[in-house]
Amino acid sequence: MIEPFLGTWKLISSENFENYVRELGVECEPRKVACLIKPSVSISFNGERMDIQAGSACRNTEISFKLGEEFEETTADNRKVKSLITFEGGSMIQVQKWLGKQTTIKRKIVDGKMVVECTMNNVVSTRIYERV
């Protein structure tokens, strides 16, 4: 279930991302920068913990966690959140909660690409990554 996600991925397309980060509450200037960045993502698993590293010319983030266990995360836009990542139906589902708000990040493999659907309230962004 985890194996298809493992490896390094690069962003190849992004739809509605600016509206999504606006819904998160990201200010105008950082939001515009976020939309220009083409990050790469590396996902690894050591049998107990999973690591997700996201990198770009502007910022690098890394999270290390056990599936199904809540953990604290500082996001790329500096939000301090409680995250929970689980696997459901072949998808990796991440729920971030902070200050009474919640966003869901759903990662799935479709035709060899990683499709990431980010949802906040009624705003959905779809980002597609291909394996490097």
UniProtKB/Swiss-Prot annotation:
Organism ancestry: Eukaryota, Metazoa, Chordata, Craniata, Vertebrata
Coiled coil: none
UniProt xrefs under CDD domains: FABP9 (cd19471)
The organism of origin for this protein: Mus musculus
Name the UniProt record assigns to this protein: Fatty acid-binding protein 9
Entry comment describing in which tissues the protein is expressed: Testis.
Keywords: Cytoplasm, Lipid-binding, Phosphoprotein, Transport
Sites bearing Phosphoserine, chain numbering: 13-14, 40, 42, 44, 91
UniProt subcellular location: Cytoplasm
Family: Belongs to the calycin superfamily. Fatty-acid binding protein (FABP) family.
